[in-house]
C-alpha cells in the first residue's frame, strides 16, 4: 500500500478484523516490521460470510455473527502501509471471512506514565 493511500503524515491507527487463528501470524508479522505494540479484542460480527445454519438437540439455529479478533495498532514512526501489508499478508487465507483493515488518523496521543504527547507517546 502506498504512503499516499494511507495518508502517511502523523499518527495513524491501523485497525484490523481477522480470523482468531491468524492472530499469532499477525503478531509475528507486526513485530518483524517494527510494530510490536498492539491491542487485541475478541469481537463478533458479520461481513460477506453467509450465516451458518445448524441443528442442536433437534432444534434448528442460525449463527449469523462470526467470532473474530480486532487488532488495533497505533503507529507514528513506521509507515501505516507497511503495517497494513504485514497484516494483510499474515491474515490471508483466500477464503471469505479473512477480514478487513482500516486506517484512521489519530488527532493526538498521551503516554500516561511519562506525560509524553504526540508521536513520542506512541
UniProtKB/Swiss-Prot annotation:
One of its GO terms (biological process) is regulation of nitrogen utilization. One of its GO terms (molecular function) is enzyme regulator activity. Pfam families: P-II. The modification O-UMP-tyrosine is found at residue 61. Keywords: ATP-binding, Cytoplasm, Nucleotide-binding, Phosphoprotein. PROSITE patterns: PII_GLNB_CTER (PS00638), PII_GLNB_DOM (PS51343). Homotrimer. Interacts with the glutamine synthetase 3 (GS3) in the presence of 2-oxoglutarate. Interacts with Amt1 after ammonium shock. This is Nitrogen regulatory protein GlnK1.
